[in-house]
Amino acid sequence: MKNKSIWNLKNTKKLFYKPFFDLMFKAQKIHRKNFSSNKIQISTLLSIKTGLCPEDCKYCSQSSRYKTGLVSEKLIKIEKVINAAKKAKKSGVTRFCMGAAWKNPKDKDIPLLEEMIKSVKKLGLETCMTLGMLNDYQANRLHNAGLDYYNHNLDTSKEFYKKIITTRKYEDRISTIQNVRNAGIKVCSGGILGLGESDKDRIKLLIQLANLPKPPESVPINMLVRIKGTPMEKNKDVDAFDFIRIIALARIMMPKSRIRLSAGRENMNEQTQALCFMAGVNSIFYGCKLLTTTNSSSKRDALLFKKLNMKMEKIKNKEKYFNKKQNSDLYENKNYYNAVC
């Protein structure tokens, strides 16, 4: 059967406001039941088309509406993608993500995107793309080319969303996720903390994700990177313990999903990252850049993994979590484990 909509504001708030260590213990217990506690999946993200986006997302350096000093770049050639993917594979990356600053791709761009997917797949890497909104036709084309994952974040709660973005409706994002899922592509969808939202908004974001007909296989949790020139350049920092609580909550609510520590990680100290791993993070972006923002250095990450005795997952191990049979019934099989409170 499909995952039931068991999460509501009452039971989720009760869980969120548990004593910190009780919440962490519960998240770690669920994490260990579903994943190896000392292994982490590594992804990297390449911007294949940079800047001049018509959207007005108030946090984004790529919006054409804000003067951020970003140098725009047209859709790059496939040779650049292949070279970047080869370097990523050598560094231990198992998933190669490609992002384009579009509201939505045009049909004329699809053939080149298909070639990018096929070329990266030939290297033995998983593929992910984030291109904006997709219609059914485009989603099916990308699926047929072999795309494994599609990223389309909800960003925040439905109620707070209109204060962040006006050029795309919340329902448009849900529709794209449905199109991706219907096409047979696995879903990557999460949000951003630090937009000025409340605890209630953060909780509602996770409720929305967890109560989808099938929760995302991958859930990136971002901490706002304040970009000069955007309306959010002076937003307040997110408290580290508040951030970790959301990680733990995401792990409990979506026990079979990859929880990815994404943007903002370069500003976190080792102790905060370690607590995020303990709370349920089992995936990170690896490399010096996330689209247009800086990321934690590979050397720094390697040192942290060594201190924590954590190992990067190898490509040969990916079938354990990502074979098609398992993904097709991720939340429906008898081993599915969840705990509301």
Curated annotation (Swiss-Prot):
SMART domains attached to this UniProt entry: BATS, Elp3
Catalytic activity: (4R,5S)-dethiobiotin + (sulfur carrier)-SH + 2 reduced [2Fe-2S]-[ferredoxin] + 2 S-adenosyl-L-methionine = (sulfur carrier)-H + biotin + 2 5'-deoxyadenosine + 2 L-methionine + 2 oxidized [2Fe-2S]-[ferredoxin]
Binding locations of [2Fe-2S] cluster: C97, C128, C188, R260
Encoding gene, per UniProt annotation: bioB
InterPro entries membership: Aldolase_TIM (IPR013785), BATS_dom (IPR010722), Biotin_synth/BioAB (IPR002684), Biotin_synthase (IPR024177), Elp3/MiaA/NifB-like_rSAM (IPR006638), rSAM (IPR007197)
Function noted in UniProt: Catalyzes the conversion of dethiobiotin (DTB) to biotin by the insertion of a sulfur atom into dethiobiotin via a radical-based mechanism.
Domain Radical SAM core: 38-262
Protein's recorded name: Biotin synthase
Residues bound to [4Fe-4S] cluster: C53, C57, C60
Enzyme class: transferase
Pathway given in the UniProt record: Cofactor biosynthesis; biotin biosynthesis; biotin from 7,8-diaminononanoate: step 2/2
GO molecular function: 2 iron, 2 sulfur cluster binding; 4 iron, 4 sulfur cluster binding; biotin synthase activity; iron ion binding
EC number: 2.8.1.6
